């Protein structure tokens, strides 16, 4: 029995509550979303705890905090904390097709911190490039940055193909005998069919 984020049983609790503000201007955009709940405590438990100004306690209530500037007619550059680009379902259950999520969602990053360059090549084709602190972390856990990419192709009004990837070194503290570290690669292809079952 796998439900949304059931980290507690037989108790009343708030899974996720958030409030957000958004700015959409012609050349600038921004979003700030604050959050709390049991899923927040669980999902931010791997954030770095030893940094003075950015640590697990100071960042876990930030769902998104980014600003963007329009570089061209169909090109945006965003910087800050934003929802992860990989995966078919969202962390906020209300945004999903069904309330009970797939277990695969727990193997993709809910959020990313970094810089995102997005460009709409045509009405059908768009691309994104990401430079991030790493796999689902706000405070960088090492000196290396991660890279990500997305290519989305709208086949029709009811169907879209999306390809995402991620590559990055996610080793937190390599020892003298482990200097190579761990490189984490993720590739995700998804086809969305927008036909309603109802």
Label each region the model flagged.
Residues 1-136, 143-148, 152-161:
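Outer membrane beta-barrel
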Residues 137-198:
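Surface-exposed beta-loop-beta
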